[in-house]
């Protein structure tokens, strides 16, 4: 696991106001990078007119690039509120984009999630209120019955194998207390709410980290590969049913900022690592957030296994015309990374790929897995839910050719993705969008509209 950082400096007139941004990278050599958590800024006020220059690692950046990076979690701001520069206050988490506290998205070099997102302001760009792209006229169909709308995505029209290949099932006993120290490490605890993800080849676990505790931190962390199992000294992470999330991770974390999560295997038995949070393996989110499909093929949505390996291995398979809860963590009670609250991040894959292909590490040739085109951030902080969508850059420039819109009666504004562009109340851009849920519930609706 590696940890890299960058420093973003802001020059003001003849004096300098210090601003910091960092990329917290962690994972395997082929891991993607995850967004950073935000720190409270530290700004010195200087009277007189201000001229701003943004410097990251010696290279100048535009205001738009900086604000977009702060909003989607790729950059950290060290200073006071940046309202006057970007139009929104300091946000909440790593991995959480402009408004939602979700762990961040990741590029090829892996990274770590961040704290809750910033305010529900639209992205920095405010172009000339461009119109949404008009739906192209349907090409004339050959004689014969009309076929239902087909995916306009770069993915194959027909997935390999069955329509729902190895879709994880389970969740039995989700409210059953876990019998600490009684279950063999090799027996996946599916009777206690955990959902086995067998296609990863890890005995049902979503990730296994072999750790060595040095004082109060894990000095070395080795991530298991397919074919390995949960053995003594390992932390063994797991998935939960839609609407639920894992409750177990140790207080100790990696010496260079890596996250570690799951049950501990000691003397051949599984032990809870976070009893003060829960003695159940899976706990519910705050509720009130859903995903809904209006199309006739499966869509694989994958949550980052965080804290843990931080790979997108927690499947949320949305069936054709399906409707499921999307887990929304509460910032004040869920995982904290280096003292900062975190939220959930999800990867949206093109329709037609089952979780066995989409919810694991991929490669640049296909827009799935860590190369999926779109990320979703979800989290609640201070009683307000923050929901966002943003492109999985710089990992990929792939475009998701479908529509995702956040709908609900109590939203702070508009947030809609269509064919790689994001629409807000003030216009359209390519950097993402965020809304808060002022009251009621909200749903991410997937369609070919």
UniProtKB/Swiss-Prot annotation:
Q: Which GO terms describe its cellular component?
A: cell surface; extracellular region; fungal-type cell wall
Which terms in the Gene Ontology molecular function aspect does this entry carry? hydrolase activity, acting on glycosyl bonds
Q: Which InterPro entries match?
A: Beta-Glucosidase_SUN, SUN
**Which residue positions does the secretion signal occupy?**
1-21
List the cysteine pairs that form cystine: none
Residues of the region (Disordered) are 96-185
Sugar attachment sites are 57
Regions crossing the membrane: none
Q: According to the UniProt entry, which residue ranges have a biased composition of type Basic and acidic residues?
A: 131-150
Q: Where is the composition biased (Pro residues)?
A: 98-125
Location relative to the cell: Secreted, Cell wall; Secreted
* The EC number(s) this enzyme carries: 3.2.1.-
Which biological process terms from the Gene Ontology are attached to this UniProt entry?
A: fungal-type cell wall organization; polysaccharide catabolic process
Which keywords belong to this entry? Carbohydrate metabolism, Cell wall, Cell wall biogenesis/degradation, Glycoprotein, Glycosidase, Hydrolase, Polysaccharide degradation, Secreted, Signal, Virulence
PANTHER family with a match to the protein in the record: BETA-GLUCOSIDASE-LIKE PROTEIN NCA3, MITOCHONDRIAL-RELATED, SECRETED BETA-GLUCOSIDASE SIM1-RELATED
The record describes the protein's role as:
Cell surface beta-glucosidase involved in cytokinesis, cell wall biogenesis, adhesion to host tissue; thus playing an important role in the host-pathogen interaction. Has hydrolytic activity on linear (1->3)-beta-D-glucans such as laminaribiose and other laminarioligosaccharides.
Q: Which family does it belong to?
A: Belongs to the SUN family.
Name of the protein in question:
Probable secreted beta-glucosidase ARB_04747
The source organism is: Arthroderma benhamiae (strain ATCC MYA-4681 / CBS 112371) (Trichophyton mentagrophytes)
